A protein has these predicted regions:
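Residues at the C-termini of beta-strands that transition into short coil/loop
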Residues: 16-18, 42-44, 82, 104, ...
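Short, charged/polar "capping" segments at the starts of alpha-helices
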Residues: 20-25, 88-89, 136
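Rossmann-like NAD(P)(H) cofactor-binding subdomain of soluble oxidoreductases
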Residues: 33-117
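Internal alpha-helical scaffold of NAD(P)-dependent oxidoreductase catalytic cores
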Residues: 41, 70-71, 94-99, 114-166
Length: 167
C-alpha cells in the first residue's frame, strides 16, 4: 500500500471481509505515520485483478484460501509475500500454479501505537521471479513496470527458489 498508493492509473485495494473490512473502511491502515484508505473489496468484487499480493500471518492462510480462489481470474498474477517457503504451494491447491509469481519480501518493520513503521531506505524489498525460463517473462516485466518509481525496492531473479530458501 505504501509504495503503490501514489501510482497513477491503477486501482489499489485490499481484499477483506467481516470486521477487518469494516475496520479498514472506517480507519484505513497506517504505515510510517501516514493513514492510507485503499478500496476495500470482497473477494468477488476483486475478481480478476491484475495483481493480488497475499500478505497475511502464516496461520491465517488456510482460512483465506477460498477468498484467494474467488479473487483470482485467468490472468491474475499472485505474489505471496509471506514468511515460510510453502505458501505458494498452499495457494496452488485452490488456483492454477501458472498464476503464481514466486516472491518474498525482506523488510524490518515494527508496530507502533498508530500502525506499522519501516525504513524504506534500508529495506531490501521484494524479490520475485519465474521458476522456469523464460525468466524475463512478460509477467516479470509488468511487475517491474508497476513497481518502478514507487520507492519500493525490488528486483527479479532467475533463482527465486534459492532466494526463498535462503531467506
Amino acid at each position: 500500500i505504501w509504495g503503490l498508493s501514489g501510482v497513477k492509473n491503477i486501482e489499489l485495494g485490499v481484499v477483506a471481509e467481516g470486521e477487518r473490512a469494516k475496520r479498514l473502511k472506517e480507519k484505513g491502515c497506517t504505515i510510517n505515520h501516514t493513514v492510507y484508505h485503499p478500496h476495500v473489496w470482497t473477494p468477488q468484487e476483486a475478481y480478476g485483478v491484475d495483481l493480488l499480493v497475499v500478505s497475511l500471518k502464516y496461520g491465517a492462510l488456510p482460512g483465506a484460501l477460498e477468498s484467494i480462489r474467488e479473487a483470482v481470474g485467468e490472468n491474475t498474477i499472485v505474489m505471496s509475500l509471506m514468511d515460510g517457503v510453502d505458501s505458494e504451494e498452499m495457494i496452488s491447491t485452490v488456483i492454477p500454479k501458472a498464476n503464481i509469481m514466486y516472491s518474498l519480501i525482506k523488510v524490518a518493520s515494527h508496530k507502533e501505537e498508530d500502525g506499522y513503521c519501516f525504513d524504506p531506505e534500508t529495506t531490501i524489498g521484494i524479490i520475485f521471479g519465474e521458476l522456469e525460463a523464460p525468466y524475463e517473462s512478460e509477467r516479470v516485466r509488468a511487475i517491474e513496470e508497476l513497481f518502478a518509481d514507487t520507492g519500493i525496492h525490488f528486483r527479479h531473479t532467475d533463482y527465486i527458489r534459492e532466494e526463498m530458501w535462503s531467506k
